[in-house]
Amino acid sequence: MVNEFDKLRPGKLLLASANLLESNFKRTVLLMCEHNEQGSMGFILNRPMEFKVCEAIAGFEDIEEPLHMGGPVQVDTVHFIHSRGDSIDGAIEIFDGVFWGGDKDQLSYLINTGVINPNEIRFFLGYSGWGAGQLEQEFEEGSWYTADATREMIFTDAYERMWSRSVRSKGGEYRIVANSPELPGLN
């Protein structure tokens, strides 16, 4: 198998392998936002929470979209990815047309005035992070795969099928993995 870790960079998807059973990351799809010699960080895309953005974040009372669990690190922080880097100061482009962060007050104003559609944004509590060498070790243990991200995938609401579709998109032997049961030992 190709060394998956070498493919990792901002804008790539990090897919939990079928063998990764740890509850924070089981069958997760993460968007990588930073990846360098000091470590890596990203957000879990397929873990919508029970409550909505309007119930949890001041200034975004009109957003009925679910808030997402970005990961187990600093779960008291709010982050967002979006497709409107042209309109939000301080946004960092992760890959073509997908941005991370920026001026939160400006974002709130643009949403409340109808300039930005809430479907163009995903809000996260916390993030997923790894120190130097940690994620590489997890790749060596077979815990992760990589895949290409698309704007459509980032802003979809098809969370339940996101992992299997992402793994299947890699083709070959991954198609079998994508269809494997969550707990193969119970079959």
From Swiss-Prot:
Annotated InterPro entries: AlgH-like
GO cellular component, one term: cytosol
SUPFAM superfamilies: VC0467-like
Pfam families with a match to the protein in the record: DUF179
Domain of life: Bacteria
Coiled coil residues, start to end: none
Family: Belongs to the UPF0301 (AlgH) family.
Name of the protein in question: UPF0301 protein Clim_0777
